[in-house]
C-alpha cells in the first residue's frame, strides 16, 4: 500500500492562477482499485494550505472471493530481492500503466491542463519490469536488468497532449466552450516535437492519451515513410490475452492507454523513425477523419495536430537511468537485449450471465435544475458557465453532475452487471470512463471493435456519434461513492458525470466494512466539512419497486 499525501500550495488568489482552474484540488488515481475515500472523485476536494492523504491499496481485485489464501504465484508482486510476495485476488486483474490527475468537479479539464497530471506504473510478479529474471512467472518484457523490478531504461512512458498559448506564451483556455478544447501544439511528455534516442533493440512504450478533447491514431514509419509494425501488449494498463501486431494502433481517446513493443534491432545507428498521428480534428466534437500515412506526412490538413509527433534516433550508446553513471553499448555482449514477448500474456475473463443490466446514455441536455439555490448543484456550479451535458439511466430523466445524487446503486460486491454505454448522438463523440472497476467489452455498434480491445480489460470506451458499447463489470470488495463520466474532460466539467455507490457485505470479513449502507456526502469548504445525505434515483436502485433489472434498448 501507498500513502500519497497531496499538499495544496496553489495561490489563494484566483488572479494569480492564470484566469482559469480551481484553487481547490483533488487527485484521482486513474484505474486504481481503491476505497472511495481515496478515489479522488467522492467530492473530497481541499483548499490552499490544506492536504489530503490518499491510501492507494495496490491490492488485486476479487481479493474477497478469488485466491483468498494467496496461493497463486501469478497473483504476486516483487519483493526487491528476486522473489515474490503472494497476495489474494485474481491475477487476471493485475494492473500496469496507470496515471493520476486532478478530479475537482466542474474544473477537471482546467486543472489537468495546467499540469496536475502524471503517469505511474504498477509492477507485479508477471510484469515486474526485469527482462532477465526467469522464475516461471515473470514475462520478461522489455525493460532492463539493473534493478530487481521497475527498470525503465527500455520501458518508457509517453504522455500525449495538446496545448495552446496566448501572445505572452502562457497557456490559453476558453472556459465558455463546452464542446471540447483543441490545442495547436501537440506535446509528448510536455515537449513540442521531441526526439528520443534508442538503441537497436526492443523497447516497451506505455502511451497515454492525456488531451482534453483530442484523440490519437498513431503509426510508426521509417525515414522513407514506410510503415513499421508494432506489437500491442496492453490497453488501459491491462495486459491483453495475446500480443497483436498492427500497422496502425487503435484510436487512443482521452484517458486511454496502449502499451506497445517496438523492435529497433532491424535499424542501424543513425537511422530515424517517427510516430505519426493520423487523426484529424476540426473542433472538439470528435474526430473529423483518419488520414492516410502519406497524406499525414505531406500535411494535407489544416489540423496542426496531424503528422510527426515524436522522432526516434538510433544510437550505439545510451546512459542508464536505472544505474546512473553506466553507459550502454549496443555492441557489448553484456548489454544485449534479453527481453521477450510471449505468445500468451494473460487469460481472458469470461463473459457470464449478469445479475442485472443497465443502459447508460451520454447525451446533450438535462432535465434537472442547475440553480444552486434549489440544490441543483453539488458542489456549487460555476455561475458563469453553461452545463449542457447529462447522462440518462434506463431511459428515464437525464441528469447532470450532482455529487449528492446517486444515479446507480450496486447492492453487494461480487455481482456482475452488463452495461450498455450509449452515445445519444447530436454530432459529438464520448469516451466513457468507469472509476474503480474495469470492464470487458462484449460488443460494439457504430464501428468495429479494435484489434487490442477484444477480450481485454478496459476502463475507457470510446463511442462515436450514435454508437454504443456493451461491457461486463464485476464490482469488488470496496464500497462507497464512485463515478462514471465522459473523459472528454470539457464535457465532464459541463456536467456529463454520474455518481454510483457500492454497498459492502457486512458478513464477509474480506470486504470493506465501512459502506454497508449509504453514507452522507462530504461538502468541503476552506473552514471545514459538512455532510449531507444523498438523493438516490429510483431507476438506479434495485431496492426500489420501479427498478427494471433488464431494461430494453434498441441498440
Residue ranges, per PLM feature:
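Histidine- and aromatic-rich segments of cupredoxin/plastocyanin-like copper-binding domains
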Residues: 31-63, 160-338, 447-449
